Regions:
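Small-molecule kinase domains that catalyze NTP-dependent phosphoryl transfer to phosphate-bearing small molecules
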Residues: 2-3, 130-132, 156-219
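Structural motif
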Residues: 42-47, 127-129, 203
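Conserved small/polar residues in nucleotide/adenosyl-binding loops
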Residues: 236-243
Length: 247
C-alpha cells in the first residue's frame, strides 16, 4: 500500500496554451475570447459558490446587465411539490427521475427573460444553472463541480437548488441531488457539451482552473480510450479506522 498512488492523473499533451489558473488568467482569457461581442453565458452545475464566482465575474467584466438563470425556474416550494413523488418519505431512498431540466422551467418567465436579453446593449452576463437555456450567447462558459465536493458542501450548510434547507440532514440533501437534481444537471451538461467555449473547474475555493472547450472535449475523448481510475475517496467518519472507497 505504500506505493499506492492516491492522486492518479493522465497527462494530455498538446494543450499547454489552453489552460488557465487563477482569476487573473481566467479574466484575461474571457475578455480575449469575448472581443467586441457582448453576451457572456456562464452555465453552472448545481452547488457552485455563487457568492465567489458571480462577484468576481461582475467585478472583472463590469457587465451592463446581469441575468440570473434561477429566475426562469419555478419557486422553491413548487419545485419541491413537483419532485415529491421522487423524493419519497424515506431518508435515503428516492425514485430516479428521468425527465429534463425543462420540466422545472416556467416557460413564460423564460420567454420574458429571453426577450429582455435580446434587446439589451452593452455587455450582458447570463449566469447560473441552466443559463444556456436563455441563450448560448457569444461566449459560453461552463462552471463545473464534482458530486463529491457538492456533498461536502451539503454537510457544511449548502442548500439544494432554490431551497433554504441549510441545516437539513445532509443525507436528505444528497437524496434530492442524487435522484433528481444531478440527473437533470448531467443531461443538460451533455446537451451543451459541444457548444462549451471555456470549461471552468470550481472545486477549490478561490483557486479556479479553466481550459478551452476544445481541450476539454479532446481530453475526455483521450481518457475514455484508455484505462483510468479516479482519486480514491476516504470516509473517515464511517468507523474508527479510516475506510477508503476506491471508486
Amino acid at each position: 500500500m505504500s506505493n499506492y498512488d492516491n492522486s492518479p492523473y493522465i497527462k494530455i499533451n498538446g494543450y499547454d496554451n489552453d489552460a488557465y489558473s487563477g482569476y487573473a488568467q481566467i479574466d484575461k482569457k474571457i475578455k480575449e475570447s469575448l472581443g467586441n461581442k457582448k453576451i457572456v453565458v456562464v452555465d453552472c452545475y448545481l452547488g457552485i459558490n455563487d457568492r465567489e464566482l458571480l462577484n468576481v465575474l461582475i467585478k472583472k467584466l463590469t457587465p451592463a446587465h446581469v441575468i440570473l438563470s434561477e429566475d426562469i425556474f419555478y419557486d422553491g416550494k413548487k419545485l419541491t411539490e413537483m419532485m415529491q413523488v421522487n423524493l419519497t418519505e424515506d431518508r435515503v431512498r428516492g425514485v430516479m427521475y428521468y425527465g429534463t431540466i425543462r420540466d422545472y422551467v416556467d416557460e413564460a418567465k423564460l420567454a420574458k427573460i429571453q426577450k429582455f436579453v435580446k434587446n439589451k446593449e452593452g455587455i450582458v452576463l447570463v449566469y447560473g444553472f441552466g443559463a444556456s437555456l436563455i441563450t448560448k450567447g457569444d461566449l459560453l462558459i461552463y462552471a463545473d463541480l464534482t458530486r463529491w465536493e457538492i456533498q461536502l458542501r451539503y454537510r457544511a450548510g449548502l442548500p439544494n437548488f432554490k431551497q433554504s434547507n441549510y441545516d437539513e440532514d445532509p443525507l436528505i440533501k444528497n437524496k434530492r441531488g442524487y435522484f433528481i437534481e444531478w440527473r437533470i444537471a448531467d443531461k443538460h451538461k451533455r446537451e451543451i457539451f459541444e457548444d462549451i467555449d471555456l470549461y471552468l473547474d470550481t472545486n477549490c475555493s478561490n483557486k479556479p482552473k479553466m481550459i478551452t472547450g476544445i481541450a476539454f472535449r479532446n481530453a475526455l475523448r483521450s481518457v475514455c480510450n484508455q484505462p483510468f481510475r479516479l482519486v480514491p475517496v476516504s470516509y473517515t467518519h464511517l468507523r474508527a479506522h479510516e475506510t477508503s472507497l476506491h471508486l
